[in-house]
Amino acid sequence: MKIKICGLTDPKEAGYVNEQRVDFIGMVLFFPKSKRNITLDRAREIMKCLVTPTLGQVQSIEQAGFDYIQIHGEIPSGYSESCHLPVLKAFNIRDMRDFPQYSTNPAVAGYVFDAAEPGSGQVFDWNLVKEIPQDDKLFFLAGGLNLGNVAEAISCIHPDGVDVSSGVEYGKDRTGKDPEKIRAFVSRARQPVGEGV
C-alpha cells in the first residue's frame, strides 16, 4: 500500500513522514486560497500538488527536481511536449465525468480521487469510484481519510495508495501535522486487509 501525506507546510514535517517511510509527500503550491499553500523554495525537495498550473510553473517544478506533479485542474495545453514530469491527476466527486479524457492521456501516471473540497477532511461515497477501471496507472484514494476509516477504505476500494492531509493534523487548537497521527495512520494503512478493522 502506497501512502501519500499531503499539505506539509514545515520542513520538520518531512522528518515525521520520512521516519514512517511514506512513499509520497505533497505540498500545495500556487494556490493561495489553501491554508497549506507554501512557496516553491520551501517545497523544493518534496512532492507538490497544484491546481491548474501554468506551463511555466510546471517547468519550474520540473527544474527543481521533483518526481511527480499532482494537478487538480486542467493539464496545461502542450504539457507532454514541454514537460516530462508524470502527472497524478486529481478528481473530486464533482468532476468524475472528466475521467475518460484523462485515462488515455500519456502524461497521466495515476489518479487521486478526492472529496468535493480537497483538504477539508470530508469523506465522500467511496462507491462512486468502484466503477472506475483500475488500469496500469496508480490509483490513490483521498478525501477525509483518517485513522478511524483508512482500513475500511482500503478494504472497500483496494486502491494502490491512500492520500491523507487533514486526517493527520493536530486539530483546531494547533496547526501542522501530528507525528503520532502520522505514525498511527501509516501503521493502520499498511496492515493486511482484514486485520484490525
For each of these PLM feature ranges, what is it?
Residues 1-197:
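Conserved N-terminal beta1-alpha1 strand-loop-helix module at the mouth
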